[in-house]
Amino acid sequence: MAKKVIGQIKLQIPAGKATPAPPVGPALGQHGVNIMGFTKEFNAKTADQAGMIIPVVITVYQDRSFSFITKTPPAAVLIKKALNLKSGSGEPNKKKVAKMTSAQVREIAELKMPDLNAASVEAAMSMIAGTARSMGVVIED
């Protein structure tokens, strides 16, 4: 018989840096999950992706056990890393902060493909390009 799910928790945690401090501790604590168990597993699984923010979906079961799925980093984080930006533009329509090639857009789209609801890489590329535009990044062909 399958275990009964009592909750799902979605968090974005820096890779390899999960600690029992907020936001992780309180979110897991209210569902009665072993916080140290989660932080150790998460840090071990994401140690190779240091410096990235990793979205994670934690499924909590009735017996207080849990399972979790890590996703690919958000598109904005990947764009900032590819262009070595601190942050996007405060006024993306007026101030442009960087230029990005379509090859870089394709690379990020291929990395994000498993988590995007896009049928093709081209559709994924247009999603990534839209995110880049909203950050004040100009896409060049």
Curated annotation (Swiss-Prot):
SUPFAM superfamilies: Ribosomal L11/L12e N-terminal domain (SSF54747), Ribosomal protein L11, C-terminal domain (SSF46906). It comes from the Bacteria. The keyword RNA-binding applies. One or more lysine residues are methylated. GO terms for biological process: translation. InterPro entries: Ribosomal_uL11, Ribosomal_uL11_bac-typ, Ribosomal_uL11_C, Ribosomal_uL11_C_sf, Ribosomal_uL11_N, Ribosomal_uL11_N_sf. GO terms for cellular component: cytosolic large ribosomal subunit. GO terms for molecular function: large ribosomal subunit rRNA binding; structural constituent of ribosome. Keywords: Methylation, Ribonucleoprotein, Ribosomal protein, RNA-binding, rRNA-binding. The keyword rRNA-binding applies. Belongs to the universal ribosomal protein uL11 family. Forms part of the ribosomal stalk which helps the ribosome interact with GTP-bound translation factors. Part of the ribosomal stalk of the 50S ribosomal subunit. Interacts with L10 and the large rRNA to form the base of the stalk. L10 forms an elongated spine to which L12 dimers bind in a sequential fashion forming a multimeric L10(L12)X complex. NCBIfam families: L11_bact. This is Large ribosomal subunit protein uL11. It comes from Clostridioides difficile (strain 630).
